[in-house]
Amino acid sequence: MPIFTAQELAERFNLQLFGDGNLRIHGVATLTQASPEQLSFLANPRYLTQLLNSRAGVIVLHADDVKTASGTVLIAKDPYVTFAKIAALFDIKPAREAGIHPLATVDPSAHVSPTAHVGAFVSIGARSSIGASCIIGTGSIIGDDCTIDDGSELIARVTLISKVRLGKRVRIHPGAVLGGEGFGLAMENGHWIKIPQLGGVVIGDDCEIGANSCIDRGALDDTVLEEDVHIDNLVQIAHNCRIGAHTAIAGCTGIAGSAKIGRYCLLGGHVGVVGHLQICDNVVITGKSVVRNSIHTPGEYSSGTPLTDNRTWRKNAVRFKQLDMLVRRMMAVSKEKA
């Protein structure tokens, strides 16, 4: 585990230091759990009480909070971002040796960079390409005509079915499936006819896709995630969707076919997005909301039902069914008074 002094961290990240610059930091932790040899941070005033009682050796905080802390502190414009960068220094991953495991299967027409790591029980299909310094984890399946650019990682048991193109430094977690058939059906004489899904999936540079998430390939055009998109676990992105750069989508969200999500959007957990609509840039959708119409103005939107005690909720549920009747009565009374 690496060790850094407070002074070294201040110089590396251009931070203002108050206190003992020779203090040695062995790791990071929360305010409540940090030891005198660890660094923590304060980014939210609601945790001010934890700051006052913290044993952390070094604390990263905003200049406005410096008077509330004792001991060694590092002043940051954005303490949360700075903490993330410092924590990355302690996130040491074991090196993977370059080469193809003897239990992996690689089609003769596929290309694997000599600097890539291909783990056990991996299958790589025809005409697929694995770039430099890629990591293809145990049990991953890469179908035909897939391209994985330099520095990307499939952690384990990731499936790229076909026509999937990953950019540079893409990271995909276990159980994710990319390039599956989109849900395209047409009704004829009382029976469903499957619509061929002839497109692919394109993932931009620096994207991350969580465990057990699915991104379907397009029917004709590709399904696209632009650069630096972050997808949580258990997210469904249907065929022909386009997700704008720097957007983040939380777990259990479902996005129906051909929806277009803008850049720098945030979708909370369990959001539903109806197909064939557009959401502009810089939109926040709070958890459990359902987006039924296009959004053309940046801002925060909600449609989820707020939590109340069960007794109140049951009463309101009954009243909700009576809303139409009550409105009609009010309109009738209003007409009589007029």
Curated annotation (Swiss-Prot):
<comment type="function">
    <text>Catalyzes the N-acylation of UDP-3-O-acylglucosamine using 3-hydroxyacyl-ACP as the acyl donor. Is involved in the biosynthesis of lipid A, a phosphorylated glycolipid that anchors the lipopolysaccharide to the outer membrane of the cell.</text>
</comment>
<dbReference type="GO" id="GO:0009245">
    <property type="term" value="P:lipid A biosynthetic process"/>
</dbReference>
<dbReference type="InterPro" id="IPR001451">
    <property type="entry name" value="Hexapep"/>
</dbReference>
<keyword id="KW-0677">Repeat</keyword>
<feature type="active site" description="Proton acceptor">
    <location>
        <position position="239"/>
    </location>
</feature>
<keyword id="KW-0443">Lipid metabolism</keyword>
<comment type="similarity">
    <text>Belongs to the transferase hexapeptide repeat family. LpxD subfamily.</text>
</comment>
<dbReference type="GO" id="GO:0016410">
    <property type="term" value="F:N-acyltransferase activity"/>
</dbReference>
<dbReference type="Pfam" id="PF14602">
    <property type="entry name" value="Hexapep_2"/>
</dbReference>
<dbReference type="InterPro" id="IPR011004">
    <property type="entry name" value="Trimer_LpxA-like_sf"/>
</dbReference>
<comment type="subunit">
    <text>Homotrimer.</text>
</comment>
<protein>
    <recommendedName>
        <fullName>UDP-3-O-acylglucosamine N-acyltransferase</fullName>
        <ecNumber>2.3.1.191</ecNumber>
    </recommendedName>
</protein>
<dbReference type="Pfam" id="PF00132">
    <property type="entry name" value="Hexapep"/>
</dbReference>
<comment type="pathway">
    <text>Bacterial outer membrane biogenesis; LPS lipid A biosynthesis.</text>
</comment>
<keyword id="KW-0444">Lipid biosynthesis</keyword>
<keyword id="KW-0012">Acyltransferase</keyword>
<dbReference type="Pfam" id="PF04613">
    <property type="entry name" value="LpxD"/>
</dbReference>
<dbReference type="GO" id="GO:0016020">
    <property type="term" value="C:membrane"/>
</dbReference>
<keyword id="KW-0808">Transferase</keyword>
<dbReference type="InterPro" id="IPR007691">
    <property type="entry name" value="LpxD"/>
</dbReference>
<keyword id="KW-0441">Lipid A biosynthesis</keyword>
<dbReference type="InterPro" id="IPR020573">
    <property type="entry name" value="UDP_GlcNAc_AcTrfase_non-rep"/>
</dbReference>
